Amino acid sequence: MASVQLRNVTKAWGDVVVSKDINLDIHDGEFVVFVGPSGCGKSTLLRMIAGLETITSGDLFIGETRMNDIPPAERGVGMVFQSYALYPHLSVAENMSFGLKLAGAKKEVMNQRVNQVAEVLQLAHLLERKPKALSGGQRQRVAIGRTLVAEPRVFLLDEPLSNLDAALRVQMRIEISRLHKRLGRTMIYVTHDQVEAMTLADKIVVLDAGRVAQVGKPLELYHYPADRFVAGFIGSPKMNFLPVKVTATAIEQVQVELPNRQQIWLPVESRGVQVGANMSLGIRPEHLLPSDIADVTLEGEVQVVEQLGHETQIYIQIPAIRQNLVYRQNDVVLVEEGATFAIGLPPERCHLFREDGSACRRLHQEPGV
């Protein structure tokens, strides 16, 4: 096992900068997830750690060793890709031991490691099968096993579940989490799926256009996003945003005017906030309230109702801003499309973002953070 540090790491192809001044500390045994939209540079960052991409400037350390000029095979890292990349003519055992065989390992060592890893990944009964006889989830476990038998210090996973169907992705997510707890290895995992990030990570790194937008624990990013990008990316359905204007400030409070002219005091940091400033109020669909238990409400026309059984999602068009807000409530809510529907805004669950997108720190203490 080993820690990983990136110091001012930049990657550029000509004039195109895909990763800019990345600074990260990944602790020994930590499970870290790089998450962000397509093209944000998360896979490039992983490939630089693996040695598959050169670093334009900056320094990469694994343990105490600077790795910039160290070949991939000597870095002590193992990588699992989106594609299983299994040899179809080899058995599961032969696929898992292939790297060790190329490295000249003794047959007894190969057999011992393959059998140990097969037990961990529940593949022992499949060792003689060929890849074509395996399910997608089993093939992915073989790909993970092939990396594990090499006993890397750092385990890199580049969107390993993207080729699986929804049910298998949930199953493999659980298995990867259990595997990390059992092995205690340093793992760095790349995904565009924020559900995978929230459920797997000890620490999440949110990337936006080649820069680190925020680093933190899952619930920290959910409850206290650093900017509007993180707020909109983490959470599903995404956070609702409303244009507001600042009408007053006080110590640790900001009053804003909503599109329907109602005013609401928000418990957020007020330092640097100017009266008259245009800002954005954010609130998650699951934090909106029924109108009968809220002091501040918004009213609109129901556009779409999504009944999911365990919850209902209602898309409401607010006339003053001509955009839909999403309201999410547990259980079944019976409402017709076209009906008038009112929702409430609890001040303590609201977020406030400046014009540059940066957040005014929320002061309400959330559980688990």
UniProtKB/Swiss-Prot annotation:
Family annotation (InterPro entries): AAA+_ATPase (IPR003593), ABC_transporter-like_ATP-bd (IPR003439), ABC_transporter-like_CS (IPR017871), ABC_transpr_MalK-like (IPR015855), ABC_transpr_MalK/UgpC-like (IPR047641), Mo/tungstate-bd_C_term_dom (IPR008995), NA-bd_OB-fold (IPR012340), P-loop_NTPase (IPR027417)
Organism: Salmonella typhi
Chain sites annotated for binding ATP: 36-43
Gene for this chain: malK
Domain ABC transporter residues, every copy: 4-234
Name of the featured protein: Maltose/maltodextrin import ATP-binding protein MalK
Record PROSITE patterns: ABC_TRANSPORTER_1, ABC_TRANSPORTER_2, MALK
Lineage of origin: Bacteria, Pseudomonadati, Pseudomonadota, Gammaproteobacteria, Enterobacterales
Compartment(s) where it occurs, according to its Swiss-Prot or TrEMBL record: Cell inner membrane
Assigned EC number: 7.5.2.1
